[in-house]
Amino acid sequence: MVSNFHLPPVGFGPGSQPEGDEELGYMQLPSGMRTYSAHLPEVEDSSAVTPALKLLDEIAAGAEACARGGMASFDLAGLDAQNRALIAETMGQGEVAMKIRGIPALMVQESVFAGVWSVAGAGVDRIEVGAVPAAALSRAFEPFRKGQTALPPLSDGVVNAPALIAELFDKSAAYVGGAADVINLTLLPHTEEDLTLLDYMLGEGAVTILSRGYGNCRITATATPHVWRVQFYNSTDALILDTIEVTTMPEVALAAREDLEDSAGRIREVLEAIR
């Protein structure tokens, strides 16, 4: 005889849930995301900062033009201390920072206006406007640590790295622009020895990028042309996505056309408020 009685589902009923002061161990989720809020520099006498205001107007026009493609550069060396300070205060610090090795070594900080970059180094003090600073493209794959072309003797823990390396070398040699080829290491079975071998074979390039926001993204150029390591971390610094991209520049580092158009408008709003 078939019984009409059914057991309750697992996880329901007395004793299935924590009681009293027992705590639940929830994973911590991202708690916030940066958003733009206008900062208006305090200027007592706008006539004393005419060069800075003129430059900001030119930067806004440059952002508008670069939204259609290309880059623009504005040298800050000719500004006196007061005008230079106004530029620095207006630019602020955005979510993307870059370290570019080479001569001269460069530190890049995106401003609060997306696509407007402060570039500093020995003898270098300028603002660049565009999807990404020029040196981040031209120097990216200059070897800080050379990659290798021949596999070394393989350790016991190596499983999938040789096949991935062969695929990446082929994609690197064939890449002529366009859409990125992405290998998602998070979804592929691999060992620590695989990662060590990949790092050894690909080498390390000249550009490291950190994008902060809803978690962090670390982008590292390898010494293999067009090959980037792109790693996403949550707000607790746990690695949640690990990829290798074959592309000119990973999209996550680029300011979009809409970003540049928006930046042009916001810089002009600041100018109007100061004047």
From Swiss-Prot:
Pfam families: HupH_C (PF04809). InterPro entries: HupH_C_sf, HupH_Hydgase_express_prot_C. It comes from the Bacteria. Residues 1-24 are annotated as: Disordered. Belongs to the HupH/HyaF family. This is Hydrogenase expression/formation protein HupH. It comes from Rhodobacter capsulatus (Rhodopseudomonas capsulata). The gene is hupH.
